[in-house]
Amino acid sequence: MSPETIGPAAVIVLAAGAGTRMKSRTPKILHEIGGRSMVGHALLAARAINPLKLALVVRHERDRVAEHVTASDPEALIVDQDDVPGTGRAVEVALKALDAEAELTGTVVVTYGDVPLLTGELLGELVATHEAEGNAVTVLTAVLDDATGYGRILRAENGTVTGIREHKDASEAERTIREVNSGIYAFDAAVLRTALEKVTTDNAQGEMYLTDVLGLARDAGGRVAAVVTEDRWQVEGANDRIQLSALAAEHNRRIIESWMRAGVTVVDPATTWIDSTVTLDEDVRLLPNTQLHGSTTVARDAVVGPDTTLTDVNVGEGAKVIRTHGSGSTIGAKASVGPFTYLRPGTVLGETGKIGAFYETKNVTIGRGSKLSHLGYAGDAEIGEDTNIGCGNITANYDGEKKHRTVIGSGVRTGSNTVFVAPVTVGDGAYSGAGAVIRKDVPAGALALSLAAQRNAEGWVAANRPGTASAKLAEAAQELASTSSQFQATIEEGKQA
């Protein structure tokens, strides 16, 4: 449905189950697939059909689930299921809560919080069919090769739906039926309300079954029909980690295929993972073993990978990111990062800049064209444009109690193994010598040197480490040097004679 289309009166998402087979302290519906919780996927699909109201029924880990849902969808109505078990009761308490302001009329959709591949498009098809045919109940079904464990859809000779038979109650003949109940429905609100008043817990499980509504609606003269989807993945739930993994893999496959159709090159889809929240431009190239998570964006002509994981990172046009682990960072157009680089949150690399091999950065802004090529750390710092930071440079930003900031200007050139002891500022165009320890501000255009003149203690090894391999090698080298000097002196004497 388009954003302008008014959707059903309400969507009810059932999310009260404990999910014990997941064997986790995290509620089942909060487990993630493709960068979004399963209930997050359910809410996204529900909102896609523009319901006037949306309710979520909770029970297990109630406060934790409610907090998560409210953070992403503050307008969703949180409804608590009481001690009466069953899907029928869950829908009944939700309907009463939705009716509190004014009694609902029209279509009510019921879906689940653990069906992460369900799309708004399929829900929209369910609603459209339900309303076009004037049905009392429309059930979403799928045809499975192996229907073991699922409720079977029973049909009359003319094809109309007559009921649902749970697997444990089905006859041998009924168990050959491959069309199964997804548990996702569109109801006429008035029919649903009336039928729920008649649903009891008088069954082997002692629960209020939502499936009982179909028979009650049919007995009251209502039409019960089905929408059959050929895409079984959209109605698959995740009850344990094995099913969760299978759904995650299928979800990822679909995301990757959609991006490839949109002009993205994925060299090895089998080793590439992309969250549903990631944005890619045309002509992006993803190399093997690349993972893109969160709000990551990658602009046109950028190359990411191999062996790269980015979370909430913005990659500019034409940039290259190789064997890098990064989060909360920005990489400018035509910039270069890696290999073996660690970008921590707050890293901003300007256009055409470079962060090279074995570098760690955190909370640092690096100007256009500046280079931090290898073996260093830059944290809590600001580096200007066209500055070259030498090998082995670090910003010593922590004094044991507080973090301090280093500011390095534009056009600066630093020698290898320079240490900046923050807080310190280096002016534009300044240089530092190799091994310098910068404890004071360096004026623009100055050369900073901090090492004393070199002094060689002749014979120290022989005196302090006699008999060692080093001492023996030093003695041999000294003898060779002495012989060479004598030979050279003889040659010079011959020239003078």
UniProtKB/Swiss-Prot annotation:
Its cofactor is Mg(2+). Binds 1 Mg(2+) ion per subunit. The keyword Transcription does not apply. One of its GO terms (molecular function) is glucosamine-1-phosphate N-acetyltransferase activity. One of its GO terms (biological process) is cell morphogenesis. Acetyl-CoA binds at N397, Y398, S416, A434. It is found in: Cytoplasm. Keywords: Acyltransferase, Cell shape, Cell wall biogenesis/degradation, Cytoplasm, Magnesium, Metal-binding, Multifunctional enzyme, Nucleotidyltransferase, Peptidoglycan synthesis, Repeat, Transferase. Residues 263-497 are annotated as: N-acetyltransferase. It catalyses: alpha-D-glucosamine 1-phosphate + acetyl-CoA = N-acetyl-alpha-D-glucosamine 1-phosphate + CoA + H(+); N-acetyl-alpha-D-glucosamine 1-phosphate + UTP + H(+) = UDP-N-acetyl-alpha-D-glucosamine + diphosphate. Its EC number is 2.7.7.23, 2.3.1.157. The keyword Transmembrane helix does not apply. Homotrimer. In the N-terminal section; belongs to the N-acetylglucosamine-1-phosphate uridyltransferase family. In the C-terminal section; belongs to the transferase hexapeptide repeat family. PANTHER family: BIFUNCTIONAL PROTEIN GLMU, NUCLEOTIDYL TRANSFERASE. This is Bifunctional protein GlmU.
